[in-house]
């Protein structure tokens, strides 16, 4: 597929890298020689393996009278689910009118039932494919009892094992299932059978930010500032939970039904009890100097990526893009980039203060949100957003 990534799994779950873009992959260590160049002579963006979920624009709900297409998944042995849906947050489902006490008791009972629920493929009507990737597919789906519309990511165990990426899926499930923020894609639960792993995900009907960027070439200042505001809010939440994303890029950002930005693909994310790591990961265009140079890094890597993203939104290409990996590497290490004339002074100031070689000199997320250019151009971010999730059957 083209470019685009709560529980700790009770058993080792064979996992996957979501549907990544068809870009050149790089390994954990970037060789100092023979990095190669784009055969076409055009600049290429370089991608490390990641769990990118690419969900194209689709309708939020199935049309009136429209039934989901028959299951399009290959036949498999009887599902043997081992995991359950995460406990829904209180009041995530709208309550009907009636006796408050009885409704509260029913809600509590439903919550307990959901906690004990073990999902199988038979619980879902499977609709059209939303995306295809190296390790599986994403389908539009509907939970049969609640009629809740969602995205079902289906990953093939054999392909995950062959690529040795099970650990990335475990990490994605562990981290994403614990996060609750309006600008972070929800992972409601997961289950597996003999051949496949299934992730029950929030459906983002407007597709990826990357597709929007391709369609429009670049964004105006108002849209860019609004996206950066939403992203900064979401990253502040992640960092408060000691989670570093490490792979922020347009392919990993989805759009909800109201156009709100949602971070997806936590395959390269980490819980950071030490807050310092040395692993190389993510997309080369977005990697900060400390990561490509193999130095220790912390949550400030996400600040660098925020600056790169802001630049790409406004200009239509990343600031360090080059014809070869070596040149991109060199530009990042030296922080060599220029602004087109149409980029305003306020935007230049914000980006330049995020793209600092010394991580300690980068703006904090709080400072990003208070930056004059952001405050002057960002529309009010979505508020009061609560996500719903499928409910369990009555016993």
From Swiss-Prot:
Coiled coil: none
Observed effect of gene inactivation: Death at the blastocyst stage due to mitotic defects and failure of cell proliferation.
Phosphoserine found at: 40, 50, 333
Residues the entry annotates as binding ATP: 134, 153, 201-204, 251-252, 265
Lineage: superkingdom: Eukaryota
Region (Activation segment): 271-284
UniProt cross-references to Pfam families, sorted A to Z: Pkinase (PF00069)
Phosphothreonine: modified positions: 278-279
Record carries keyword Phosphoprotein: yes
Top-level EC class as recorded in UniProt: transferase
Cellular compartment(s): Cytoplasm, Cytoskeleton, Microtubule organizing center, Centrosome; Cytoplasm, Cytoskeleton, Spindle pole; Cytoplasm, Cytoskeleton, Microtubule organizing center, Centrosome, Centriole; Cell projection, Neuron projection
Gene3D superfamilies the UniProt entry points to: Phosphorylase Kinase, domain 1 (3.30.200.20), Transferase(Phosphotransferase) domain 1 (1.10.510.10)
Residues joined by cross-link Glycyl lysine isopeptide (Lys-Gly) (interchain with G-Cter in SUMO2): 249
InterPro entries (UniProt xref): Aur-like, Kinase-like_dom_sf, Prot_kinase_dom, Protein_kinase_ATP_BS, Ser/Thr_kinase_AS
Biased composition (Basic and acidic residues): 100-114, 386-395
Catalytic residues of the enzyme: 247 (proton acceptor)
Other information: Centrosome amplification can occur when the cycles are uncoupled, and this amplification is associated with cancer and with an increase in the levels of chromosomal instability.
Protein role: Mitotic serine/threonine kinase that contributes to the regulation of cell cycle progression. Associates with the centrosome and the spindle microtubules during mitosis and plays a critical role in various mitotic events including the establishment of mitotic spindle, centrosome duplication, centrosome separation as well as maturation, chromosomal alignment, spindle assembly checkpoint, and cytokinesis. Required for normal spindle positioning during mitosis and for the localization of NUMA1 and DCTN1 to the cell cortex during metaphase. Required for initial activation of CDK1 at centrosomes.
Protein name: Aurora kinase A
Origin species: Mus musculus
High-level lineage: Eukaryota, Metazoa, Chordata, Craniata, Vertebrata
Gene: Aurka
